[in-house]
């Protein structure tokens, strides 16, 4: 029975290949035919039903220039599919679909901020796109969004439609396959993840930034030579993906030759960057902290904190990181100042409460208050093994 299931899964994958190839050639009839033939294999895997039904809806939309009314609901994946279908059909409701998605409290849908910005630029709503990225912080945004923010701040609007367009059905299906690849990656099924990632790249090779997931998959599999090969796709033209490349190369050096050599490598690359972005400063501070070079980490954290506005959301986290570095050096006065200020900004941060409480207990200082903080931290995150 296991062999039968394996064969059925392979048959389904083979049909997905045929469907993808038909879509690439703009042959919707053939894609639909192969999809119908795959029907008997879609129940063999929990993702296959989602893939089958989503592709059925997309092909119907591309072929008939309207949205299928009789369709199954897969929760947030259906919301994502609906947003792209409306965008493809140039419906005004695409805007509300993207907004519903990125404001959804049931998960992290920040990737779709990129597609909302792309939609705004495609519809000549440049000022609205500027407003969206104005709300993003470089330090705590995803790789794709930091690059997007940089493009808009440098007026490089054409770069968005160069890599993705809602008018192109292949770009849309490519993004859906990328989503499936991400789902498999989150299950540590890197072989399946790379299968869908390769299909995604086949349909839209312009979206070279998606190869960062390929690099991550190979890295998690400790296939470092393949990681290095993929990373060569990222050059200085897209500075945040180039920085991602440097960081990943550094991690490989650390794993193979130790922290000292890794820190030397990233430091030499960092020094060559003119006017490095705060995100890059933040990353190198974290590398120094992880390598126990706390003085250097403090120097960089201080530089970032000094540049932030008083109401910056990320200040609390930076004070926590700098405070932890002071604590490791035995400078308890400054450590306590930073950690208490971090809690003043965000009183319910369980990790900060936990860290400060244990620091005080180890010093036999403010014991009653420390125990109260521990109890509060546990109440906030009682399912967290680190609390």
What kind of feature is each model-predicted range?
Residues 1-261, 275-294, 314-328, 350, ...:
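Alpha-helical solenoid repeat scaffolds
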Residues 296, 300, 343:
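Catalytic core segments in nucleotide and nucleic-acid processing enzymes
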Residues 3, 192-200, 266, 339, ...:
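Amphipathic alpha-helices of TPR/Sel1-like and other helical repeat/solenoid scaffolds
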